[in-house]
């Protein structure tokens, strides 16, 4: 059963200080943490294994395997929404990411398949696709980085986001988690974040 927006109220600054108000979660399918780190230009031998607290203190990224996916967790960083990074990182596979920065009220969401953007939420622009007249429609100006395929598999989630029960909320308030779950099959939980050990590194030139 897919979660509802209210199911993510646990992800709060009170429980996750230093993360919930400035985070980026990125999911990459079919790779290992070591392969993801290598694609990011980081030498595996320069990485270390850390807990979530250690990752937050370092304000860097950490990678952990979750089933067939790798989850990248970032504190106060936005590699997962930098198109110059995530477009090549998605080569031959699927990448899903979402980002929030509380101080600016800034939300972003990406779904990329093999270098082509399938769906996006952009700060101050909104969703790239929405349901109008019962159909998924493209809302942004088209450019070559976008896939021509419509993200029909998201129709149910978009309808729920815009339902009378769950009125439209900012992505970080639940919709981004719902969309990521639909696209990856992974439900974000406190246990997943708190009990994982992360392969932690620094991307060259990111600081």
Cite the ranges covered by each PLM segment.
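Short amphipathic alpha-helices in soluble, non-transmembrane regions
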Residues: 35-43, 88-89
């Amino acid at each position: 059963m897919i979660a509802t927006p209210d199911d993510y109220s646990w992800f709060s600054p009170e429980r996750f200080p230093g993360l919930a108000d400035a985070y980026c979660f990125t999911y990459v399918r079919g790779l290992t943490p070591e392969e993801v780190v290598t694609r990011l230009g980081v030498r595996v031998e320069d990485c270390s294994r850390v807990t979530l607290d250690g990752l937050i203190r370092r304000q860097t990224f950490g990678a952990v395997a979750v089933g067939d996916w790798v989850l990248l967790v970032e504190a106060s960083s936005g590699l997962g929404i930098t198109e110059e990074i995530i477009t090549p990182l998605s080569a031959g596979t699927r990448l899903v990411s979402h980002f929030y920065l509380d101080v600016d009220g800034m939300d972003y969401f990406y779904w990329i398949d093999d270098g082509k953007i399938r769906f996006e939420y952009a700060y101050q622009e909104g969703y790239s696709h929405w349901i109008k007249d019962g159909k998924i429609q493209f809302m942004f100006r088209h450019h070559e980085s976008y896939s021509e395929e419509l993200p029909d598999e998201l129709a149910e989630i978009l309808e729920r986001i815009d339902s009378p029960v769950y009125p439209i909320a900012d992505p970080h308030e639940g919709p981004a988690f719902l969309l990521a779950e639909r696209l990856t099959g992974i439900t974000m939980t406190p246990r997943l974040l708190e009990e994982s050990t992360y392969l932690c590194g620094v991307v060259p030139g990111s600081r």
